[in-house]
């Protein structure tokens, strides 16, 4: 188990909500969606245990992701990104986003047409939505969505990673860890049962002598 812990990538050992360098500001006006998508892909690459996650940048994904705006479908380094719309009504949007984030720990690009502006929505923790807003007018890093330039009520659509071709290695490691934990649990159970058997045998012997 100790060896397995050494082999695990940082993504399994470190909370994604702890910023290790995921976030940055957009390079110029009008590229909030591109910057947010780059941060999303960066977090996903980190989650996959890829050392190259630090190389995922706004300019780096532009050639494949940008066409006068963020493309509704594109692929970067075997990570496929798609586009979807949100239901109407704040309550329905909130419920949908909570479910989406549960399936996408890397986050999603959330777009508010009323601004217009986009952020990387990172997580929903203790009843609060968090994000990283690429706008220079908002604090850097992971902040509550209430401190950002958009709102849940105004949000209408989002981009998310629909398929990831880089997570096979991570899945194998997770399976190996689960196998190690199961083996350790089985061994502990066997030892407990053996000890119980020995105690029962001792009691039977004592009873045969003095019973």
Residue ranges and their predicted role:
Residues 9-13:
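Sec/Tat signal peptide C-region and signal peptidase I cleavage site
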Residues 26-35, 91:
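Soluble non-cytosolic domains of exported or imported proteins
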């Amino acid at each position: 188990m100790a060896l397995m812990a050494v082999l695990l990538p940082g993504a399994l050992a470190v909370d994604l909500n702890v910023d290790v360098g995921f976030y940055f500001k957009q390079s110029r006006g009008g590229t909030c969606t591109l910057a947010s998508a780059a941060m999303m892909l960066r977090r996903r690459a980190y989650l996959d245990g890829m050392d190259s996650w630090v190389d995922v940048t706004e300019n780096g994904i532009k050639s494949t992701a940008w066409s006068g705006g963020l493309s509704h479908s594109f692929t970067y380094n075997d990570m496929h990104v798609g586009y979807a719309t949100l239901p109407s009504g704040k309550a329905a949007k909130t419920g949908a986003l909570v479910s989406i984030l549960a399936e996408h720990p890397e986050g999603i690009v959330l777009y508010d047409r009323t601004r217009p502006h986009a952020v990387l929505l990172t997580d929903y923790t203790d009843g609060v939505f968090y994000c990283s807003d690429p706008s220079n007018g908002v604090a850097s890093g992971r902040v509550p969505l209430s401190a950002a330039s958009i709102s849940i009520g105004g949000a209408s659509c989002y981009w998310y990673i629909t398929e990831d071709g880089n997570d096979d290695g991570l899945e194998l490691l997770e399976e190996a860890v689960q196998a190690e934990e199961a083996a350790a649990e089985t061994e502990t159970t066997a030892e407990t049962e053996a000890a119980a058997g020995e105690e029962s045998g001792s009691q039977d012997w004592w009873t045969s002598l003095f019973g």
